[in-house]
Swiss-Prot record:
Cofactor note: Binds 1 divalent metal cation per subunit.
PANTHER family found in the cross-reference section: 5'-NUCLEOTIDASE SURE, 5'_3'-NUCLEOTIDASE SURE
Organism: Bordetella petrii (strain ATCC BAA-461 / DSM 12804 / CCUG 43448)
Classification via Pfam families: SurE
InterPro entries named among the record's database cross-references: SurE, SurE-like_Pase/nucleotidase, SurE-like_sf
Keyword tags: Cytoplasm, Hydrolase, Metal-binding, Nucleotide-binding
GO cellular component: cytoplasm
Positions bound to a divalent metal cation: D8, D9, S39, N91
Family from the record: Belongs to the SurE nucleotidase family.
Protein name as it appears in the record: 5'-nucleotidase SurE
HAMAP family: SurE
Compartment(s): Cytoplasm
Length: 252
């Protein structure tokens, strides 16, 4: 089995190292990760400059681009053989609910999924790398279980792991995405030169953390596994939009 591993925290991140170590023995690993932290990069690709690729001292391949760049370059320019699985993480912090739209960790996995490859994004629910070894142990078990399945189509899984000892994990739940309140306002400050600058504010608290959501599972101490899709079509509104757009359809 061939596994492509990436992340968004950068090629020196403890979460990436822990994940790679945990996956040893499962197959041939290729690690391609960003040169610097690209948290919040979402699915962006770098189109306005060329990308450089080098092998770092730790043996990982690093790219001066986004997480999506890393997976795209790996799949279309670096790997001679298509991988059987793309794995991203382990992220320093949760990627639940609305986070998935912004997450570079999820985006790296999604890039593989766009190429028709099963993919899994792993995140540690609290920042700071506490219990990262336990999270890596969970990640290995999820990967082992996923690759053992004979699924009709590739899956894209978003996995959030509580920051706690392995023995204290309260099981695993298959969940839907919850929802956050809007982010906090930007933080305005002034540079020593008198210029006004703005920092993006903290993420909002959970607005939908009902049973069955990723927020609820992690709050209960359980690992959350959410299958994702990339079709953003709101199918339930197609007929409604067709009705109000009908005059335009006839006149344009």
């Amino acid at each position: 089995m061939r596994i492509l591993v990436s992340n968004d925290d950068g090629y020196t991140a403890p979460g990436l190292e822990a994940l790679v170590q945990a996956l040893q023995g499962l197959g041939e690993l290729t690690v391609v990760a960003p040169e610097t932290n690209h948290s919040g990069a979402s699915n962006s690709l770098t189109l306005n400059r060329p990308l450089t690729v080098r092998t770092a001292a730790n043996g990982f391949i690093c790219v001066n681009g986004t997480p999506s760049d890393c997976v795209h370059v790996a799949l279309t320019g670096l790997m001679d053989t298509r991988p059987d699985l793309v794995v991203s993480g382990i992220n320093n912090g949760a990627n639940m609910g609305d986070d998935t739209l912004y997450s570079g960790t999820v985006a790296a996995a999604a890039e593989g999924y766009l190429f028709g490859i099963p993919a899994i994004a792993f995140s540690l629910a609290e920042k700071g790398w506490a219990h990262i070894e336990a999270a890596a142990r969970v990640a290995r078990q999820v990967v082992e279980r996923q690759v053992a399945q004979q699924l009709a189509a590739p899956v894209l899984l978003n996995v959030n792991i509580p920051s706690r000892p392995f023995e204290a994990m309260a099981g695993l739940q298959v969940t839907r995405l919850g929802k956050r309140h809007p982010s906090e306002p930007v933080v305005r400050t002034t540079t020593p030169y008198g210029d006004t600058v703005y920092w993006i504010g903290p993420v909002g608290l959970a607005a939908d953390a009902a049973p069955g959501t990723d927020f609820h599972a992690v709050a209960q101490g359980a690992v959350s596994v959410t299958p994702l899709r990339l079709d953003l079509t709101q199918h339930s509104q197609l007929d409604e939009v067709r009705r109000w757009a009908e005059p335009l359809c006839a006149s344009l």
